[in-house]
């Protein structure tokens, strides 16, 4: 790909920005007197309190996490795709396979281990999310604690010296993370295991 190094750098740049800086930037932009609401007012629309609405606060948190980690996930997947032997693609095209068929039958199965890795790490990162909602909502999880995460609850119990509850939350969080990670990993790599088992049986015969 032409200029692939440049595009990789541009895509990865948001990942280098600290979560605290990202949160403060979004807090300023989407505040009641921020540039987004000023633009809405100039268009004759009422002020939308992003941080006071459940959909607004959750949407901003989701958008920030997407922007911060999109680059990292893209680079990992691109590395997996670029590592595929081009000879396999050329052979498939010669056999008359379409681009969609090549992607579905060749590219996707080959990068499944990488997809499993990205899904599991994204899942763990989502469960352990703390810095963005903590800073954006000033640690309160507003509105009405709908933006509270498990780690924010854990942090509150630690600061209130309720160490028993904090320890219990840590264990529960670990179990949930482990179970979900194993489920996602096995679900994504299921076809690979089945294919490998069938191949080994044929080889023995």
Residue ranges and their predicted role:
Residues 1-205:
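A structural signal for multi-pass alpha-helical bundles of membrane permease subunits
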């Amino acid at each position: 790909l032409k200029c692939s190094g440049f595009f990789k750098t541009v895509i990865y740049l948001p990942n280098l920005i600290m979560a605290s800086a990202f949160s403060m930037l979004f807090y300023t932009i989407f505040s009641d007197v921020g540039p987004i609401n000023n633009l809405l007012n100039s268009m004759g629309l009422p002020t939308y309190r992003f941080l006071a609405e459940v959909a607004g606060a959750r949407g901003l948190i989701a958008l920030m996490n997407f922007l911060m980690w999109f680059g990292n996930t893209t680079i990992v997947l691109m590395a997996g795709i670029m590592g595929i032997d081009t000879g396999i693609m050329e052979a498939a095209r010669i056999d008359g396979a379409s681009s969609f068929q090549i992607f579905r039958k060749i590219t996707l199965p080959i990068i499944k281990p990488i997809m499993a890795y990205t899904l599991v790490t994204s899942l763990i990162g989502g469960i352990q999310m703390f810095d963005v909602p903590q800073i954006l909502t000033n640690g309160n999880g507003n509105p009405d604690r709908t933006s509270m995460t498990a780690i924010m609850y854990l942090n509150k119990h630690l600061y209130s010296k309720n160490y028993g509850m904090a320890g219990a939350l840590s264990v529960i969080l670990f179990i949930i993370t482990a179970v979900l990670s194993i489920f996602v990993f096995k679900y994504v790599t299921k076809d690979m295991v089945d294919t490998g088992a069938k191949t080994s049986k044929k080889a023995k015969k």
